[in-house]
Amino acid sequence: MEFRYLPMTNQDKQEMLDAIGIKSTEELFSDIPEHVRFKGEMNLKAPISEYELTKELTELASRNIHTKEYTSFLGAGVYDHYIPSVVDHVISRSEFYTAYTPYQPEISQGELQAIFEFQTMISELTGLPVANSSMYDGGTALAEAVNLSAAHTKRKKVLVSKAVHPEYRAVIDSYTRGQSIDIVEIDTVNGVTDLAQLDQAIDETIAGVVVQYPNFFGQLEPMKKIEQLLENHQKTMLIVSSNPLALGYLTPPGEFGADIVTGDTQVFGIPAQFGGPHCGYFATSKKLMRKVPGRLVGETVDEEGTRGYVLTLQAREQHIRRDKATSNICSNQALNALASSVAMSSIGKHGLRKLASVNMQKARYARKKLLEAGVELAFDGSFFNEFVIKVPGSVSKINKQLLDKGIIAGYDLAKDDKSLEGYMLIAVTEVRTKQEIDQFVKELGDIHV
């Protein structure tokens, strides 16, 4: 018999059929009506050699547009940052090269310590005492925070700013829809949350208030004023989604009274690869420690007094509590968390502040040059490394023309909100040079729409 794939032997097949008490594989599908079954063979290409396959896949991959060949000003949640070479060196080591949770601490001390260091650095950045081992990405981390606020306060309404990333808001909707949690969106004014509307919406039925800092439009929310709005609503939780790189320079949300801070560490050591995989983080106050989703690594000592690391407070988790678990998240992004840990460690505390500062300086240079070229800014508030401009005509058409010039331009905000037709979100990171920024401004000015 000629096989089109690497098969089991006929003897293997017969032994399995005998073990389950049937005579043929046909019997396995006897409950599927005959008229809906697939007949014949699938229309697959003939097999080729490994060399031929590698060549074909390489040719397919070469059609992709990537930031090694194109200059990118695209952000909106996925950013083009420099990744120190030490990151790949460390995460490629065989003892680390896994995303699986280290349930056996006696053979996983290295990985557990690395996760512990990740938690520690996130805690320092956010200004909160407890951080978990990681989440899938920034969106799921934020959605888990919303669920936690509802469970902790025993309330079923959450206020979410429209300045929060639209994809994050979509994930929140997916998480909460089946749990009868009412999501109320708060409008924006000049690129930040409408505080007057927020103030009117807060009452004794609100579980949490969700804002992003810096927000989706790159603007810095007035966190002190938001904190003041919540002073008379002690049970209502303040949930903040933050770019951790920005927190290397900005005041940590924990100092503004945030109960939960979440975000995405893609900015540290994780490449922009079709939007994933990423690594979410989740930090909170001590009072919520036993309700934190995901894994927690703790430091302890063994009976001989030797320092060690273990998964702790596991009674929260679904492999023990089942349906009473604080969350149904059942894994983490350990490998990507390690990449972020290595990146943050190699940058260092002072280096992180300098890196954040360079992002801010280059973004301000780009904004200045665009203004000089006659481009109109959408908002005039403070920002980190992203800002919104107005362009004449369709952003998608302009982006297509710029792509022909070797430039990946900003995000078309009309994709998520038709009222923002002609608005482009620009991201400028440390890897953009003065020449690249000047070229972008020139090419944008030369486009006729």
Curated annotation (Swiss-Prot):
Which E.C. number(s) belong to this protein?
1.4.4.2
User: Any keyword Oxidoreductase?
Assistant: yes
Q: Name one GO biological process term.
A: nucleoside metabolic process
Q: Report the GO molecular function annotations.
A: glycine dehydrogenase (decarboxylating) activity
Keyword Oxidoreductase on entry: yes
State the function annotated in the UniProt record: The glycine cleavage system catalyzes the degradation of glycine. The P protein binds the alpha-amino group of glycine through its pyridoxal phosphate cofactor; CO(2) is released and the remaining methylamine moiety is then transferred to the lipoamide cofactor of the H protein.
Family to which the UniProt record says this protein belongs: Belongs to the GcvP family. N-terminal subunit subfamily.
Quote the protein name from its UniProt record.
Probable glycine dehydrogenase (decarboxylating) subunit 1
User: Per the UniProt entry, what species is this protein from, by scientific name?
Assistant: Oceanobacillus iheyensis (strain DSM 14371 / CIP 107618 / JCM 11309 / KCTC 3954 / HTE831)
